[in-house]
Structures are given as C-alpha cells and as structure tokens.
Amino acid sequence: MTTPNKINFPPPKLQIDFAFALKRFRAVYLQSALLETVRDMDIAELDRQLSKYVPPADLATLAQYGLRAELLFAVPAVLEANPHLLGYYRLLMGYSQKEFYGRDKGFGVGCFKSMEEKGKAGKAAVADLHDLCVAFCATASALLAGVGPLRVSRELLDDLTLLTVGPQLRGGANNQRGADGIVLVFEIIREIVAHAAAEVRESAIEVNSATGRPVLIEFAPDPDIIIREEMENQHYRNVVAIEVKSGTDVSNIHNRIGEAEKSHQKARQLGFTECWTVVNVGRLDMVKARSESPSTDRFYSLTALSLRAGDEYADFRRRVLSLTAIPARPANP
C-alpha cells in the first residue's frame, strides 16, 4: 500500500492541448510552412522581389549567416503563394492578433485577416499587398539591426515566432474555457426547466410558464445568458441577465468581475430585474466581489452548479424556476 504524497499537481491538460495546437501551427503558420511553400516557388522571381524590397545591407547580413531573406522579409510572391504565411511574419515581428488586426487599437490592416485565418485575400488585401510588404520589410530590417550582436539563425527566428505563439495559444485556451463555461451553465438551466420546455433550439429554450406567456432562455453576446418573458409578439420583459466568468486564475478574477459589472450595468439599463455572476475560482472574497460588482444580485460557483447538488445549486434551481414562473418537476411516484 503506497502512502499518499503530500504534494499533488493537476494533470498538465493545457500543455497537452498546446502540444497538439503547436503541431497544427507549425504546419500552417511557422517556419516549416514557409520552407514548404518556398520549395515549390519560382526562386528566380522570389529573388527578384527580395532584391526590390529588402535593403542590400540586410541581404548581405543574412547571406553571411547562410540564410535566405524570406525567412525574415515578407514579399508579395510568398504571400500570394500561401496567404496563411501572413501569420508567420506577424508572429515573427511579435505582434498579437488583437494588436495587429484590432478594429480600435490595431494597425489598420484588418482587411488582411482572412489571409492568415482562411488563406484567402480579398480585393482590399490584394490592392494593399505591396504596402503591407513594405511595412513588414521596414520592421524586419529594424529587427535584424536590433539583434545584430546575436548570431542570426533559423533557430533564433523560429524561437521568436514561438514567443508570440505562446500567449496566442493561451488566449485561445482561455476563450475556449470561457465558451465552455457559458455552455455548461446553459445546459444546467436546460436540465432544470426541461419538464416545461416547449421548444429547445441550439441557442435558445422556450418554456411554458404559469402565466401562460412563453419564457425564453437564450445565449446572448452581452450578457452571456438572458431570460426574458414574451409579453406579446416581439415585446419582452427582461428578467435575468447571467454573466459567466470561467477563468480559473484567482489573481485575475477581480478584473473579470469588473467586466461582469459593466455588462450588468447595461443589463439594468435594459430593464433586467436580476443580474447573476457565475465564477470558476475556489476562493472568492465575497465582500470585495460585491464591492466590485454591486449590480450583481447573486454570485454562484461554476463548480458548485456543475455538481447538480448542494445548497448553492438548490438556490440557483429555485430561483430559475421562480423567475421563469414554472413549477418544479413533479416527483416520481
């Protein structure tokens, strides 16, 4: 019989997911994808464009290290052959997707996003491809000069792209966790009201309430889940707004609660009578949480709700049934 260890760590699920995601990234966005693309290109035409876009001194520096210039410098021929490689050059220069493509604080190059994500260039992107490459080459030249004291190598350039990929993968994992949490809360509500459901769709549940008026439980962009009573055709009484914060990082939970407060303030303006916030951390300072989101009527733990048992789940269930005006499921005889 083995003695239980005093120290236990959770399984490295995030790193396992990252390993598979990185494999996909390498095949589409990283250096191996660039090398595969260049292998099938007209090298004479590629060299002609490189001599046009890249300063001669930079070409000489790369040649000194036995490197081809397209490893660092973007030219139209490469991006036309494989539009996904826009992602390679973005990552190499250290720009996040939000920073690069963002509508409010981005670089004004949102029209190129479909190249990276879908491998397709729209009319606006095609028209501005020259300017994009000029801008990339200027930045690449600054990067080459900045790392001058180091020996530039394929390995170094690959490492630089990975430094940008890491936060992007983590951000994607966080977004997926957030989406999964919202779906879980929606599913828990669906189970609670299933016996009174008139219609269940992918993004909404319609239930028959005791008032005789339909009640809709729906996914929404902001807040995450809403419950509304239909007074007459296309006229609603807003009942409950639910914000789900699925992140498990305790150090960041108060920022997330602040985000929930902004959403709930909007919900109050829209006439929602109840605002709930579901969180996914083990220890929450309720005094601080209530001060950060005074609009939140009830805080719930995602873990407690997912158990489908216990005082917290029972309170959540009672309130859902009460505010949707439907009776509890009849007990089995």
From Swiss-Prot:
**Does Oxidoreductase show up as a keyword for this record?**
no
This enzyme catalyses: Endonucleolytic cleavage of DNA to give specific double-stranded fragments with terminal 5'-phosphates
EC number(s) reported in the record: 3.1.21.4
Q: Which domain of life is it from?
A: Bacteria
> Can you supply a Gene Ontology BP term from the record?
DNA restriction-modification system
Keywords linked to the UniProt accession: Endonuclease, Hydrolase, Magnesium, Nuclease, Restriction system
The EC category is hydrolase
Q: Where is the signal peptide?
A: none
Cofactor(s) of this protein: Mg(2+)
According to the record, the segments passing through the membrane are none
> What's an example of a GO molecular-function annotation for this chain?
magnesium ion binding
Oligomeric form and interacting partners: Monomer.
Regarding protein family, the annotation reads:
Belongs to the XcyI type II restriction endonuclease family.
Can you name this protein? Type II restriction enzyme XcyI
What organism is listed for this UniProt entry? Xanthomonas campestris pv. cyanopsidis
Gene name tied to this protein:
xcyIR
